[in-house]
């Protein structure tokens, strides 16, 4: 009887500790068994830079973007990813991006119609799914998510890109990262925000490069900023 009571108290203590550090049970998702989804394709390790629609990307990122386009278009998608580029890589000194676009592997995409500038709401989830399947950590940044009246767009970081800035890499597997089931945005209170678009999509090539489903795993280097990087000053 005493052992049963002690066990119950232990379980309750663990539950209280978990909720206190995560805010809710939603912040402690668990990984699912790995089954490689159809459409996975390992990008080439080509870091030659080129300009596309006024934005600079390396060829690895561009190949991933084009693969995502093919996946998305095959499902009836109507937006053009190259034409929709609003920010590329290697663009430092942009405060709103808090360093994520300073290196390679980062892209922002418009979700608006080129015809009438309306938000193409029905295209957003198919775009995100295709980008994630192609190897990006990708999320919708809705209006006002980053600062008052910040424009709606998709933000994507190429998993495994060797040119990633430290802040971009943190969005993949840092405290607030995609592979941990979160939205990639550092929070002043230190509590990660759950990914609104579901869990990460993994391919075998990502596992081969040691990128795993980290949901529910302890976070290394748990500094104030959530990674080895200091917490940036958000606008």
Residue ranges with predicted function:
Residues 20-36, 221-235:
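Ser/Thr-rich, Proline-interspersed low-complexity disordered segments
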Residues 27-146:
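Secreted/periplasmic proteins that engage bacterial cell-wall peptidoglycan
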Residues 49-55, 97-98, 114-232:
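Catalytic cores and adjacent binding grooves of peptidoglycan-active enzymes
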Residues 1-4:
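Positively charged n-region of N-terminal signal peptides that target proteins for export
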Residues 8-18:
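Bacterial N-terminal signal peptides
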Residues 12, 23-25, 108:
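Cleavable N-terminal signal peptides
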